[in-house]
Swiss-Prot record:
The active site is at residue 130. Homohexamer; trimer of dimers. CDD domains: MoaC_PE. SUPFAM superfamilies: Molybdenum cofactor biosynthesis protein C, MoaC. The keyword Lyase applies. Catalyzes the conversion of (8S)-3',8-cyclo-7,8-dihydroguanosine 5'-triphosphate to cyclic pyranopterin monophosphate (cPMP). It catalyses: (8S)-3',8-cyclo-7,8-dihydroguanosine 5'-triphosphate = cyclic pyranopterin phosphate + diphosphate. This is Cyclic pyranopterin monophosphate synthase. It holds the Pfam family MoaC. It comes from Bacillus thuringiensis subsp. konkukian (strain 97-27).
């Protein structure tokens, strides 16, 4: 495990200087999920949620969150993102409906986009909750995690199952 780089000589927080790092293509894929009732699943599927098209709004929220990550995560560098893709997949078991959220982020720069992907996945799930809470507040946001990252000095990473 490498040492922490976000502390100065006095032990105080600092933003890491990345000016000497080589600009490379960097990608990250993050996942999250939200479990909803059959009623919410049906309303989302038939576009019957009063606030609008849940998946379209959540997708836009995820993209916006990726772009604004450095505004809410203190030590993240502002990045020029080259692409953000938010996708959805439903999984059903018994009366449980799980909306799987996957976010892919890409840049060419001196630092990775893991935090942008994770922030986007989280904001996407939170937006689904916000738009559907009038129907049922018992929704459960699942684990949010990094699935994969490429590029940079630390190399590639793929989450083990």
């Amino acid at each position: 495990m490498s040492s922490f780089t976000h502390f100065n000589d006095q032990g105080r927080a600092k933003m890491v200087d990345i000016s000497d790092k080589k600009a490379t293509v960097r990608t990250a894929i993050a996942r999250s999920s939200i479990v909803v009732t059959k009623e919410i699943y049906d309303k989302i599927s038939h576009n019957e949620i009063g606030k609008g098209d849940v998946l379209a709004v959540a997708q836009i929220a995820g993209i916006m969150a990726a772009k604004r990550t450095s505004d809410i995560i203190p030590m993240c560098h502002p990045l020029l993102l080259k692409g953000v893709d938010v996708s959805f997949d439903w999984k059903q078991s018994d009366e449980q409906y799980r909306l799987l959220i996957e976010v892919k982020v890409k840049t060419e720069g001196s630092t990775g986009v893991e935090m942008e992907a994770l922030t986007a996945a989280s904001a996407t799930a939170l937006t689904v909750y916000d738009m559907c809470k009038a129907v049922d507040k018992g929704m459960i946001i699942g684990e949010t995690y990094l699935l994969e990252k490429t590029g940079g000095k630390s190399g590639d990473y793929t989450r083990k199952s």
